[in-house]
Amino acid sequence: MQTKDIKNFKMSDDVYKLRRKVINHIYELRHLRLPRVEVRIGEARHSRALLGQAALKDRKVWITKAAINMGERVLRNVVFHELVHAIYGFNHDEKCPLMQAKLDTILSKENCIEHFTKYHKKFN
């Protein structure tokens, strides 16, 4: 599973720990019974501003180490944003703070779950 914008890290104990942080945020949505999503961790090849990427409706997400290092709240916003792309195929929406193209608003856990749930209900 590759992308041209993020270079995958090879799996190791350290990478597994990073990946676990991403998966823990996915588990915060387990009440919605989401499909299995493949998760890769890596580093941006070109733009340091890139925090994550998803294959639209293909249930694959890439999260950068930089996003993980920005803390739990930022990481949750990035993970939920990429999940909307990966699961539902929905593109950016500047009117929704979760789905803006740039991470301008950092949402609380409750607000992230609330916005994600709206997409889940819309597409299920």
Protein language model features and the residues they cover:
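Short alpha-helix carrying the canonical HExxH Zn2+-binding catalytic motif
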Residues: 71-87
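Metalloprotease/metallohydrolase-associated module, dominated by Zn2+-dependent proteases
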Residues: 4-73, 90-124
